[in-house]
Amino acid sequence: MTTIVDSNLPVARPSWDHSRLESRIVHLGCGAFHRAHQALYTHHLLESTDSDWGICEVNLMPGNDRVLIENLKKQQLLYTVAEKGAESTELKIIGSMKEALHPEIDGCEGILNAMARPQTAIVSLTVTEKGYCADAASGQLDLNNPLIKHDLENPTAPKSAIGYIVEALRLRREKGLKAFTVMSCDNVRENGHVAKVAVLGLAQARDPQLAAWIEENVTFPCTMVDRIVPAATPETLQEIADQLGVYDPCAIACEPFRQWVIEDNFVNGRPDWDKVGAQFVADVVPFEMMKLRMLNGSHSFLAYLGYLGGYETIADTVTNPAYRKAAFALMMQEQAPTLSMPEGTDLNAYATLLIERFSNPSLRHRTWQIAMDGSQKLPQRLLDPVRLHLQNGGSWRHLALGVAGWMRYTQGVDEQGNAIDVVDPMLAEFQKINAQYQGADRVKALLGLSGIFADDLPQNADFVGAVTAAYQQLCERGARECVAAL
C-alpha cells in the first residue's frame, strides 16, 4: 500500500539524516496532542539545528493505541500535521520519532529496556489526568486503582505509565546509571508535582530506599502546554488525504498557534526547545493560571452557553457578536484581575489572540466536546476566580452566568426539548437531582455536590443568589438572550 514514505507529496519530507537521531526521550502516550505539540517542537529543532534528540514513542493501551504504533511503523515513523488557519492550511511531515513501541508487540521488557538505556535523558508523558492514578480527594496515588494494584503485584511487568517509570528508575539505579527527568506534558495544573506525587507514592509502596533515591536524583519539571488539537475524525483524515494525495492514518489537524512554557529543571540534559518557540522559565504556575482562567474558563463559558444557544462549534458561537464580546469581557474584567503575571505580560493581547483562535472556523471544535467532564473542570476554571471576587468585592456576573450555564446544561435537555448527551463522571448524581428537583431547588441540590462546590460556596448567600438568578433567567429567556443582556 502506498504511504507518505513512497508517494510524491506536495510537501517536503524531513531532509536530515534520520540515523543521526538518538532515542534520548521516551514518551509515554503518543496521542494526537503530543504529535501536534512536543513531537513537532522536537521536529523543528532537528530541522533548524544539528540536534540529535529523537523520541522513542510508547503507547500502553490496547486497541487504537496499538494500531497507531503499527501504522507509524509502516510509515517509517513519519506522519502529517495539518495546521489549519482561518484562510489556509499548512501541511508538515514530522520526523522526530526514532522508535515506536507497544507492550503487545515489544513486551514490557522492550519498553523498560528503552527507558533504562544510558542515553535516555527524559521520560515525558501525555497520559491524561486519569493516567496519574491519583485519589480525587487527597491528590495522593490511589493504591486501590486496579492498574496500581497490578503494578505492585507485578512490578517487572507494569501496566500503568507510573509503574513503568518506577521500574525503569529501579533498573537505572541498579545499573549505576544517572536518573532521567520525568516531564509531564498533560494539560493538568502543576503537572510536574502531580507526576512526582504519583511516582514517589508507588516507589514508596514498593521500596522506601528506591523512593529516597528518586526524590534525590529525579526532577519533575512543570510544563504549560497549549494548542487546540481536536480529535481526528474520518472526515479530517480524508480532508488531509485529499490535500496530500495519499492517505495517512496517523495524520492530525490542529490550529496554527502553539505555546509551551517549561520549568527549567532537568537532571540529565534537555533539547534547546527555546530555539523553536518554547519558553524555559523558573516558575510555570502564573502561566498555567493565565491559561486555565482566560482560555479554559472562557472556553467552558462558550461551550455551555453556546451549546444551549444552538451552536455546534466554538467558532460558530463567536460569530455571534454578543458571545464574542461576553467572552472577551469575562477574560479581561473578571479573570485577568485574579492573576499575578511576570512583568511584561500583556493580558489584553493574550485575550485578543484567544478570541482570534476561537474564531478559526476550520477547526470545528465542538461545544459538546468542551462541555464534557464539567464537574472536574468547573472548580479550577470558574469557581476559584469567583472565590477571589467574593473576597475582594470584584464583579463576576459573567462567571455567574457560566456556572448557571453548566447547571442548565446538566439538565440533559436543550432549549428545544432535545436530549443532551451529558458526559461526566458525576452523571448519575445529576440524573438523580434532575428526577427530584427543578428551578431554585435544583440549583440548591447541585450546590450540595461538595466535590464541585466544596463547603464554602453553598454557604455564601451572594454566590447562591447570583447563580440562582442567572439559572432562572436562562430557563426563562434562553442562552442567547442572557448572553446579549450581560
UniProtKB/Swiss-Prot annotation:
GO MF term set: fructuronate reductase activity
Bilayer-spanning residue ranges: none
GO term, biological process aspect, one: mannitol metabolic process
InterPro entries per the UniProt record, alphabetical: 6-PGluconate_DH-like_C_sf, 6PGD_dom2, Mannitol_DH, Mannitol_DH/Oxidoreductase, Mannitol_DH_C, Mannitol_DH_CS, Mannitol_DH_N, NAD(P)-bd_dom_sf
Pathway stated in the Swiss-Prot or TrEMBL entry: Carbohydrate metabolism; pentose and glucuronate interconversion
Catalyzed reaction equations: D-mannonate + NAD(+) = keto-D-fructuronate + NADH + H(+)
EC assignment: 1.1.1.57
Annotated keywords: NAD, Oxidoreductase
Annotated residues for binding of NAD(+): 25-36
Similarity comment: family membership: Belongs to the mannitol dehydrogenase family. UxuB subfamily.
PANTHER family xref list: D-MANNONATE OXIDOREDUCTASE, MANNITOL DEHYDROGENASE DSF1-RELATED
Protein name, per record: D-mannonate oxidoreductase
Naturally occurring in which organism (per UniProt): Escherichia coli (strain K12)
Taxonomy of the source species: Bacteria, Pseudomonadati, Pseudomonadota, Gammaproteobacteria, Enterobacterales
